[in-house]
């Protein structure tokens, strides 16, 4: 979903159900609809759902964005790249290779669907464009603001302290619904959702504006909020927005995406996720990702959940049933 093309962030999981699917489709890899996934690269003259598994048995072939931190970049940085390296070691793969393409419309078709790679490292659970593994992390949109200021203690977008403040928001993402309900849109600053990540970065631009004082707070997809706040030092609070009610979900499970035919590959990855969850968590946390358990409690290093926090019934009602380690 990024603040870039897909933001790696969900852009709407609302009720009724048809809205939920539209939202997930928009999220996944630009979260824009990709109507058809041709299977010309598959072994049979079929579409994306060919029954033949084409996974490379020796090399972990990863589909990635060339400039989309904290997820990945062409320099080999990002938590997706580190998780991929971990999986390669655990699965006995001799190497990790990458097929880079901006995560905008056509990403799945041009990478996984063309058999250039065998795994998309981050994909929202429930989207139809790929087959999902079990989730390997769960996070939420987050509010970022300077520590020690008048916004200290804010955990809801409807908090009166935000009235009249200039809040940055990526256009078309779920927090916008709550901001509109709270009357914050009149003074909000919108940043584009669909962009070419090689040229611009909405999350980075938003955090730069926050540091300059051009906006008072920022609302971003959790991994981006945590990463850019961490890069800025200890000056910003990152608050997962898990207490919003009566609107689209704000917390989502993130999986790995594989081809629909790759059933054994999916099972292999599910085992690897379950066996290495603590190490995966530590990688994500090192990038500032605000990890949440199923009750919206923050997850600490080595997978230990903190004692505080609370669940969001709307999120659990809208989210698919499969948990992080099913």
Residue ranges and their predicted role:
Residues 93-95, 113-122, 165, 210-220, ...:
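Alpha-to-beta junction loops
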Residues 44-52, 174-195, 270-326:
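Ligand-binding clefts/hinges and TM-proximal coupling segments of bilobed small-molecule sensing domains
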Residues 45-123, 127-128, 197-199, 287:
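Extracytoplasmic small-molecule ligand-binding "clamshell" domains
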Residues 66-70, 74-90, 143-202, 223-224, ...:
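Bilobed "Venus flytrap"/periplasmic-binding protein-like clamshell domains
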Residues 85, 97-161, 172, 242-249, ...:
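Acidic, polar ligand-binding/catalytic clefts
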Residues 44-45, 78-91, 149, 157-174, ...:
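Extended ligand-binding regions for polar small-molecule ligands
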Residues 65-66, 138-150, 230-273, 290-316:
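Periplasmic-binding protein-like
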Residues 44-75, 158-166, 309-326:
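Immediate post-signal peptide segment of exported/extracytoplasmic ligand-binding proteins
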């Amino acid at each position: 979903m990024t603040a870039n093309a897909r933001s790696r962030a969900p852009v709407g999981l609302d009720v009724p159900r048809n809205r939920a699917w539209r939202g997930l489709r928009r999220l996944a890899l630009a979260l824009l609809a990709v109507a058809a996934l041709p299977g010309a690269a598959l072994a049979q003259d079929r579409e994306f759902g060919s029954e033949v598994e084409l996974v490379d048995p020796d090399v972990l072939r990863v589909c990635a964005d060339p400039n989309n931190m904290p997820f990945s970049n062409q320099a080999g940085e990002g938590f997706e790249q580190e998780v991929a390296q971990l999986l390669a070691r655990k699965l006995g793969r001799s190497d990790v290779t990458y097929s880079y393409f901006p995560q905008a419309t056509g990403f799945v078709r041009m990478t996984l669907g063309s058999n250039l790679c065998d795994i998309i490292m981050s994909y929202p659970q429930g989207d139809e464009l790929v087959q999902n593994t079990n989730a390997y992390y769960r996070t939420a949109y987050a509010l970022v603001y300077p520590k020690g200021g008048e916004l200290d203690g804010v955990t809801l977008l409807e908090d009166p302290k935000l009235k009249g403040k200039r809040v940055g928001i990526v256009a078309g993402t779920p927090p916008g619904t709550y901001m509109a309900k709270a009357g914050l849109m009149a003074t909000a600053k919108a940043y584009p959702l669909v962009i070419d990540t090689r040229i611009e970065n909405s999350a980075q631009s938003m955090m730069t504006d926050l540091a300059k004082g051009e906006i008072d707070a920022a609302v971003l997809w959790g991994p981006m909020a945590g990463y850019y706040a961490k890069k800025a030092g200890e000056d910003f609070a990152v608050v997962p927005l898990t207490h919003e009610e009566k609107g689209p979900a704000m917390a989502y499970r993130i999986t790995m995406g594989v081809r629909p035919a790759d059933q054994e590959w999916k099972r292999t990855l599910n085992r690897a996720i379950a066996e290495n969850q603590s190490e995966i968590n530590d990688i994500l946390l090192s990038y500032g990702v605000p990890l949440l358990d199923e009750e919206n409690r923050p997850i600490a290093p080595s997978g230990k959940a903190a004692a505080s926090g609370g669940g969001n019934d709307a999120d659990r009602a809208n989210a698919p049933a499969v948990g992080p380690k099913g």
